[in-house]
């Protein structure tokens, strides 16, 4: 009698094929952002924020963002964010355009949300439609994280 051992079928590696093929195909894509579901970097999650109006989306998918930035639902619209930087520590940036849009930014030195005039284009994500949204994202988040 043969010794008691687990006899694996001859086709043991073929069972992995359905899992390996999609992985190989996604790995070979020239633009890695096209395989969005594979990557671990995730967008920040915020509690429901009450917005007076929905902002124009800067992006719809990660591949529409430059470099390593990710397309995230942030404040009141979708924006390209660099997940390695703290948005609330960015300086005030009105951008090069000449619109007159009252906005709010978080000043890390004073720990306050301060009103400024946004030009309507470019700038950075430390730019909120209201003081309430700025407070919700930058001040309340910091209070919660200081407890951890």
Swiss-Prot record:
Positions of transmembrane segments: none
Signal peptide: 1-35
GO-annotated molecular function: serine-type endopeptidase inhibitor activity
BPTI/Kunitz inhibitor domain location: 88-138
SUPFAM superfamilies: BPTI-like, Elafin-like
One Gene Ontology CC term in the entry: extracellular region
Domain WAP: 37-84
Protein name from the UniProt record: WAP four-disulfide core domain protein 6B
Bridged cysteine pairs (disulfide): 43-72, 51-76, 59-71, 65-80, 88-138, 97-121, 113-134
Database matches in Gene3D superfamilies: Elafin-like, Pancreatic trypsin inhibitor Kunitz domain
This protein's record includes keyword Heme: no
Native organism: Mus musculus
Keywords tagged on the record: Disulfide bond, Protease inhibitor, Secreted, Serine protease inhibitor, Signal
Recorded superkingdom: Eukaryota
Pfam entry (one): WAP
Subcellular location per the Swiss-Prot or TrEMBL entry: Secreted
């Amino acid at each position: 009698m043969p010794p008691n051992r687990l006899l694996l079928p001859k086709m043991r590696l073929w069972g992995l094929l359905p899992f390996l093929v999609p992985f190989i195909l996604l790995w070979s894509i020239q633009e890695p952002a096209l395989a969005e579901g594979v990557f671990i970097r995730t967008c920040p999650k915020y509690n429901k924020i009450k917005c007076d109006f929905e902002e124009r989306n800067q992006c719809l998918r990660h591949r529409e963002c430059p470099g390593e930035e990710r397309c995230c639902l942030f404040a009141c619209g979708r924006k390209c964010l660099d997940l390695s930087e703290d948005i609330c520590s960015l300086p005030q940036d009105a951008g090069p355009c000449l619109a007159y849009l009252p906005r709010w930014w978080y000043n890390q030195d004073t720990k306050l949300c301060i009103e400024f005039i946004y030009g309507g284009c470019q700038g950075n994500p430390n730019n909120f439609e209201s003081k309430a949204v700025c407070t919700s994202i930058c001040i309340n988040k910091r209070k919660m994280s200081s407890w951890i």
